[in-house]
Amino acid sequence: MSRSVLQPSQQKLAEKLTILNDRGVGMLTRLYNIKKACGDPKAKPSYLIDKNLESAVKFIVRKFPAVETRNNNQQLAQLQKEKSEILKNLALYYFTFVDVMEFKDHVCELLNTIDVCQVFLDITVNFDLTKNYLDLIVTYTTLMIMLSRIEERKAIIGLYNYSHEMTHGASDREYPRLGQMIVDYENPLKKMMEEFVPHSKSLSDALISLQMVYPRRNLSAEQWRNAQLLSLISAPSTMLNPAQSDTMPCEYLSLDTMEKWIILGFILCHGILNTDATSLNLWKLALQSSSCICLYRDEVLHFHKAAEDLFVNIRGYNKRINDIRECKENAVSHAGATHRERRKFLRSALKELATVLSDQPGLLGPKALFVFMALSFARDEIIWLLRHADNIPKKIADDFMDKHIAELIFYMEELRAHVRKYGPVMQRYYVQYLSGFDAVVLNELVQNLSVCPEDESIIMSSFVNTMTSLSVKQVEDGEVFDFRGMRLDWFRLQAYTSVSKASLSLTDHRELGKMMNTIIFHTKMVDSLVEMLVETSDLSIFCFYSRAFEKMFQQCLELPSQSRYSISFPLLCTHFMSCTHELCPEERHHIGDRSLSLCNMFLDEMAKQARNLITDICTEQCTLSDQLLPKHCAKTISQAVNKKSKKQTGKKGEPEREKPGVESMRKNRLVVTNLDKLHTALSELCFSINYAPNMVVWEHTFTPREYLTSHLEIRFTKSIVGMTMYNQVTQEIAKPSELLTSVRAYMTVLQSIENYVQIDITRVFNNVLLQQTQHLDSHGEPTITSLYTNWYLETLLRQVSNGHIAYFPAMKAFVNLPTENELTFNAEEYSDISEMRALSELLGPYGMKFLSESLMWHISSQVAELKKLVVENVEVLTQMRTSFDKPEQMAAFFKRLTSVDSVLKRMTIIGVILSFRSLAQEALKDVLSYHIPFLVSSVEDFKDHIPRETDMKVAMNVYELSSAAGLPCEIDPALVVALSSQKSETISPEEEYKIACLLMVFVAVSLPTLASNVMSQYSPAIEGHCNNIHCLAKAINQIAAALFTIHKGSIEDRLKEFLALASSSLLKIGQETDKTTTRNRESVYLLLDMIVQESPFLTMDLLESCFPYVLLRNAYHAVYKQSVTSSS
């Protein structure tokens, strides 16, 4: 097979262009990272900033590229010491520059080959060949510009080479050429303009072919709107027709890329601008569109200035310089507005497209081209804005700020999501298209070719066979398609048929090129949807504009109408890894970490914003709930009572206070309250949080809803504790009922969040409220349980001990007593049945158990002190125990007792604490009976049916269960546990038992002394005594039950003994004649009745045998009579 000396098939143009383009991007990545490292003092190679090497570095740079080591020993002495380390650490940098040089050689060789072969280049016909050719030239140009921007390049290369020479006795073999290249490309564009003179014909032909594409792509928003671009519903009759074009791949080709080709390309072959009007118009159009172009990532080129600086030194280029200045002025004044209008149009166009496709995903088949065009157009506009916002004068900054950019990105993400979700739908459509239409048309085209060499015939036959063999069943079976080989074959075929002496020339068979370009697009719809999404909508460039990225996000959150699109920012973080390259693997971790930190930060900020809105709504709702509290109706009642009298006076009364609920009355729908605004803002933001169930960023899965959940938990915890309004200095705290109202209002708002976001708010309640039933939460902070427990113990019960508050059994509450110093709180408002029920609701069984344990700890400390007093009087008490029927001896023994008042006071304190606990337990039982009636009744059955012969351990387990449910027990398990901890190793069990028995004796013989106390008078109205001695009944019974359970004694026998001693002692005061000692005798008699009434072990018959009932009856008559007299 005879061909020309340079056979196209042997030159492998397609393969070389593919490989060199990929390698060029890799080299750019490496140079970019070197430039950034050298610009960062922390990442810069230490040898460049080492003070000891400063003179050596300056010398090397000054002499570069010459190498002089002989006569400069003094300056290079320090270098001699560190040569091995320098060789080791600068090798990566040095050989990157060597790789750039080799890449340059390969590119120059390939460009020469293309020139020699006289390759025909037309973007509308041999798209892949032309695109790759232009990409290679731009990559090569960018690479050399990037190289020239690394200021430390001479120092790095020189340091490495000098170290190499000192180590090996000779320069590195690549150094001479490398050094010369660095010097030659000090001004890269100027050097390349000279270098590209021989390539001008090929390059200008390729660029001129863009005349068919670029002008019709670079239109204004108004022209787009008039053409109804990207609209599926503008022509309903053609909705199902496939979107077709003679230049399919050009339709979604990046405008940004084309502008880069045109601007850099015509700078390199500038001669044609003077001879060809088409080229000049194309170039001027591109110059007017931007102020700068992207070289790589965030590296830009201000091309107006660069071109002007190059042309100013060329004779006869005044016209071109004027053109540049004119275009620059036009770009500065009009480009911002033009692109702003485009973004505005694209927002509505993409919204329409996404909405239609979500409703009818089947349209993704025929209208796939529209989707990728929309993505490409939007991506170009976003990148343009990002690039210019960071590189424009502050005077015109307003044109480059777009508060609605998040909306455009969001619709891009929606379209991307549709393509990923409905990929199989598109596959089915295009598999049928390829086999049923494309294969047939291509076969006819091939059959009609007048000339078709063997190689080309084989390739095209394989195309037809491949497409014909496709079937829908392959899609249904989940078969993985791979048309990469077919696409590479078409690329090869373009190369074979585009050379000047080709037997089958594409210039003569343009229809074949256009048909194949369409077929290639269709194959990509089957096997390369993900790659197509990256090609048309990758926004990984945001990774390198972190400040602008974060600023856009903050603007989005601040604008309520845009906050619903804020999820687009975390979604963009999923793009970042696509900008990495295998030739620079070391940056993967850096970019991956950045994507993770940004995604985390965005989701966290969104959740915080939502949390703050929810908190504001909760605050409003708590205020509204507070208005409904009973305390606020007092003013209304007083106004109603005084209404008549105010009418009679004829004076105008006070204006009526607004009643709760008035905020819901609207005069018209235009009235918007603060609560309305908050709900609107919240619903918008929650839409965003709920949009994506999860997202994968660098193999890490993020769940936006979990961010909101965790923030709600933290804020709910803080709010509950904050709403207690506990002040440690003044000892003020919110009433439990008011806190409960606020908490319920808060929970109602949180429950409504489930209408916006699919989160498990019950889980939040369980986590937070259960933690609040413990002493400390998971962060070690105090909870409402600890705050209320401390307050009731340290404030309320302490004031009871001080005599400022009394327990009123009739009211089942603690009530303030009139004293000189008024208390800062009303005890009744914190201890009545409604407040205790509210407390039980808030603390729950666990919290109430903690409260009980804290109360018992205080009781145990009082019992410990009582035991000490018993030990002090042990001999006297032992004798009194056996002499209760000998009045004279008892009187003598009583006089020898010490600390009688202390014993009674401590027992009263114990009684007060137990009375408070009984209130708390009763409230807990009421609350649990409401919430879990069947479970409470089952526990009650357990407790009521314990056989007397049951083992005490088993009985105590049942009592513990009952106590946790708020049920009263014969023996208090919490008290037993608290007193059991007092067991001493130094005292024998027998001695402990004896002390317990004598304690009961001490209390019994001390009771008569209460009669002399003025405050011991019984009040029938409160069913108790103002000095709380009525609480002794509870204290005596429960302490006896607990102590004798611990010491395995008979509770009943010991209480009988107590009753005998107490009745004997009280009967003696009946014989007393001193009115002072017997002033409240009748009131004290009633204690015996209370003790028996309180006890499950004593009976009235037993009391009758010890103490005549007639005395009790007379005592009741006397105290009631006395109360009537005192009240009258």
Curated annotation (Swiss-Prot):
Coiled coil: none annotated. GO terms for biological process: cell migration; cell morphogenesis; cell projection assembly; cortical actin cytoskeleton organization; neural tube closure; neuron projection morphogenesis. Residues 651-665 have a biased composition (Basic and acidic residues). Residues 640-665 are annotated as: Disordered. Signal peptide: none annotated. It is found in: Cell membrane; Cell projection, Lamellipodium membrane. Its main location: membrane. It is a single-pass membrane protein. The keyword Transmembrane applies. InterPro entries: Nck-associated_protein-1. It comes from the Eukaryota. Pfam families: Nckap1. One of its GO terms (cellular component) is SCAR complex. Keywords: Cell membrane, Cell projection, Membrane, Transmembrane, Transmembrane helix. The chain crosses the membrane at residues 995-1015. Part of the WAVE complex that regulates lamellipodia formation. The WAVE complex regulates actin filament reorganization via its interaction with the Arp2/3 complex. Actin remodeling activity is regulated by RAC1. Plays a role in neural tube closure. Belongs to the HEM-1/HEM-2 family. This is Nck-associated protein 1.
